[in-house]
Amino acid sequence: MKEFNCPELASNWLKAGKILLHPTEGLWGIGCIVDSTAINLLSNLKRRNNKKGYIILVPNLEDVRRLFQLKPKYFPTLHNIWPGPVTVIMKTKNNSLSLVSDDNNNVAVRVSDHYHLKNLLTFLGQPMISTSANISGKQNIFDLDDIRNTFNDPNVALFNKPLGKLKKASTIIDIESMQIIRK
């Protein structure tokens, strides 16, 4: 499996429509750019239904403001939880994320505080789709060798940087209702 230690090279791999295993705050992730061919490849690798939503990662709050409809009353909440391991469901501003939004234009988005992931996202310069690096419906995989074996495909590379210390998936909240979807 191809490996990258440099965020710029890893971002170029993604921009070519390929799939990247990457560290997050808590779990190994696997992701791609918002592109129908890349999303189909990712879904096939994970054996995942394309109708199930993906999380979008962006490097900062400015990108969130640019891509999503945000009421000013939500700014304090978002400033308190981001950057960090909290994913927020919110409405997109336009159709730029239509490949990953639900019927109501909602998308799950996170501004990560994982140093290496933030660097990767900055070099990428566009939203990145991410999900846990496991087969859909199966247990999370923490061992990197097991992940490499599970996703051994010429279109998959590894951004080989340390995993965060959280050891679980991110919390997910709905910004409109403030309901916790996943703890």
Whereabouts are the PLM-identified features?
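Active-site-adjacent structural elements in enzyme catalytic cores
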Residues: M1-K183
